[in-house]
Amino acid sequence: PNDASAREALGLATDIGGYAIMVGGTNGAHLTSFSLVDIASHGRGVALMNPYYTVFFAPAIQDQLRVVGRIYKKYGYMEEDLDALSGRELGEAVAKAMMALGRKLNFPTTLAELPGFTQAHIDRALVAAKNPQLDMKLKNMPVPLDASSVDEYMGPILQAAATGDLSLIKNMK
């Protein structure tokens, strides 16, 4: 209660979470987090995955990324001119700011940093995403997917999250 910096960070996280909720549809990070429950809490899994799905969703959520990006910029987590960026470049800038905040908080920014993480977690997430009962969750994402596109698009997102290499993420054309 007496740590003003921590209180400010919590407020910032709350704002960012609120903006994430305002994005229509389902977030892939939320869907993926259920396959990580043996190594990360639900919230931790979502927070870790958000930067990677941000890059994938970027062309469809540019207005929201500019709003969130201004918050990151205000607090020194990004230097880029948000108005000069669009699409994937905007998504990468915001994703890097998300990861910078995570690193400042000593929060893992890659799956490989989670004790117990293995390729089996990625495999489990890909299998789970193809479950017919989750079809509407895939279709409701800002960039809709279906079971036939999970490996092609979600697979690289998860590989990027394992390594921190945003260049692995493929955007739909």
PLM regions and their residue ranges:
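Active-site segments that bind and position negatively charged phosphate/pyrophosphate groups
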Residues: 1-97
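C-terminal charged capping/lid subdomain of soluble metabolic enzymes
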Residues: 76-173
